Amino acid sequence: MSGGIKTKFAWAAGVALVVAVPAAAQDAKKGEALAQQQCAACHGKDFLTPIDATYPKLAGQYQDYLEKSLRDYKTGARKNAIMNGIAKPLTRGDIRDVSSYLAALPGPLSNEKR
Amino acid sequence: MKHSSLLLSGALLAMTQSSAAQDNKTAAVAATAGPDVPVSMCIGCHSIPGYQASFPSVYRVPKIGGQSQQYIEAALKAYRQGARNHPSMTAVARGLTDQQISAVAAYYEARGNSPVVAVSK
């Protein structure tokens, strides 16, 4: 109606923003929610204080290693009664989101030569 | 009430101190690499930030500095008995005694970021 090219362009740009920004934000939110629901009970709310010392600290671990571990637990290539059950229903996207969230958290984990 | 909680904390303190004394040897061993702490097999992958394993699949080898001693021990024993599979880790773990596993695990627990800092993924 009154919309010239300018208005249409602004409208399209607005749509692109609305679609692009929340997608990443939603992934991060999803990762955080998954981690709090699925991991925190055993690995600690900060993912550094597990309820059993033989459970690993997760915060700050490499994302690709976390993903590989979860994939291996999901397929059964790595065996652990609890972790196999936790990983089974996770999708590839879930595994990526939760691993990305955990990897970005602060923690003592390091591969620096000391 | 006050008295008994004081007694209890005294007892707890005594327990903490005696277990600290027992841990002294482990702590001392954790300080330096050597024949008792054979980390020469570890550092080629685990002391290089961002180092990628390329076999059997490509991903960064996990950060183990600052990980708990008990978890590292459990992981090495799982590799040693075949409960967890990775060609190089299985080979490394099979060459270690229980004592060496404990020493290596303590060594790496003591090598985390301190104080805790934010890390990049």
Regions found by a protein language model. Give the residues of each.
Chain A
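Bacterial N-terminal signal peptides that target proteins for export
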Residues: 1-12
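N-terminal alpha-helical segment
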Residues: 11, 49-51, 79
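N-terminal signal peptide c-region/cleavage motif recognized by signal peptidases
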Residues: 20-22
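Sequence/structural segment immediately N-terminal to covalent heme-attachment motifs in c-type
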Residues: 26-47, 61, 111-114
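Stable alpha-helical elements in mature extracytoplasmic
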Residues: 27, 35, 62, 69, ...
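Gly/Gly-Pro-rich "capping" loops immediately C-terminal to redox-active cysteine motifs
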Residues: 32, 44-75, 84-88
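C-terminal capping alpha-helices of c-type cytochrome domains
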Residues: 75-78, 86-113
